[in-house]
């Protein structure tokens, strides 16, 4: 019986060894097959990855170009809106001088003819300024606005309400919504 038992144990061992060996061989074959990667497949996967990366870069570049175009359009619009600002600043003293010349009283005919010519010149300049979006600011009775007006003095006045312009010492000018020169005014108390 012992011999039979030994023989049975040997048979079991041999069967186990064969089963384990077969299992190991199967596992090794499977691993070898998995390890054998098709080089074309690897290249395809790499190319697909590269394509995705390039598509992402393209989208980012297109977005950046669009942002640059929008920024340029806004800047161009601002430049166009305020393009006469420098010229207007240079012309305003001439307008002031022409207005002062018209305030001079005169009786003779020659002076009246000169005054008429000055009025026409002033009218042409004011119209040209208006056509370019430049307007005067600071009228008597207008509410004082520190962004548009510069208060030179405060005066008592029965003609206008408190915090309104009582006297305009020098007109102010605006181009669109930007102050070129604040009006110098006296404000009622």
From Swiss-Prot:
Gene3D superfamilies cross-referenced by the UniProt entry: 3.90.20.20, Head domain of nucleotide exchange factor GrpE
Tell me yes or no: is Transmembrane helix among this UniProt entry's keywords: no
Give the start-end ranges of region Disordered: 1-22
Domain of life from the UniProt record: Bacteria
SS bond list: none
Pfam families attached to this UniProt entry: GrpE (PF01025)
Keywords carried by this UniProt record: Chaperone, Cytoplasm, Stress response
**Bias kind Acidic residues: ranges:** 10-22
BP terms from Gene Ontology: protein folding
- Listed GO MF terms: adenyl-nucleotide exchange factor activity; protein homodimerization activity; protein-folding chaperone binding; unfolded protein binding
Subcellular localization, as worded in the UniProt entry: Cytoplasm
Give the matching PROSITE patterns. GRPE
Name the major location.
cytoplasm
Q: What SUPFAM superfamilies is this protein classified in?
A: Coiled-coil domain of nucleotide exchange factor GrpE (SSF58014), Head domain of nucleotide exchange factor GrpE (SSF51064)
GO annotation, cellular component aspect: cytoplasm
Q: Per its UniProt record, what HAMAP family does this chain match?
A: GrpE
Q: Which family is this sequence assigned to?
A: Belongs to the GrpE family.
Q: What does this protein do?
A: Participates actively in the response to hyperosmotic and heat shock by preventing the aggregation of stress-denatured proteins, in association with DnaK and GrpE. It is the nucleotide exchange factor for DnaK and may function as a thermosensor. Unfolded proteins bind initially to DnaJ; upon interaction with the DnaJ-bound protein, DnaK hydrolyzes its bound ATP, resulting in the formation of a stable complex. GrpE releases ADP from DnaK; ATP binding to DnaK triggers the release of the substrate protein, thus completing the reaction cycle.
| Name of the protein described by the UniProt record | Protein GrpE
Q: Which organism is it from?
A: Leuconostoc citreum (strain KM20)
Gene name?
A: grpE
